[in-house]
Amino acid sequence: MNIHNKNIVITGAANGIGHALAKRIIQESPKSISLIDISSSVNEVARSMNADSYVVDVANENDFQSVLNSIIDKNNSIDLFCSNAGI
């Protein structure tokens, strides 16, 4: 799959599988990458990758939907969503 110039969202990106996935995907030059995690350490991870970060509990449907709406407002779309929270 070609992800160059795509808008990517990765949950659970502060560590583990989500973090590893973000590090790999950033090498493919996506148009944007948005990292989501319940831990505020996602902010540091995002800064190191020149990505956007959002601290939210994905189990809280209203808060999570608000973050997704913000991402769509900023980037016009989400082309690839990688759900890794809680894995």
Task: Specify the residue positions occupied by each region the protein language model found.
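Flexible N-terminal pre-Rossmann segment of NAD(P)-dependent oxidoreductases
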Residues: 1-9
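Conserved glycine-rich cofactor-binding loop
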Residues: 7, 14-16
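Conserved Rossmann-like nucleotide-binding pocket used by diverse enzymes
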Residues: 9, 34, 54, 81
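Rossmann-fold scaffold of SDR-type NAD(P)-dependent oxidoreductases
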Residues: 11-12, 78-86
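Residues forming the Rossmann-fold NAD(P)(H) cofactor-binding site
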Residues: 19-23
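Conserved glycine-rich Rossmann-like NAD(P)H-binding loop of the short-chain dehydrogenase/reductase
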Residues: 26-44
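The beta1-alpha1 cofactor-binding region of Rossmann-like NAD(H)/NADP(H)-dependent oxidoreductases
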Residues: 54-67
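Glycine-rich phosphate-binding loop signature in dinucleotide/nucleotide-binding domains
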Residues: 71-76
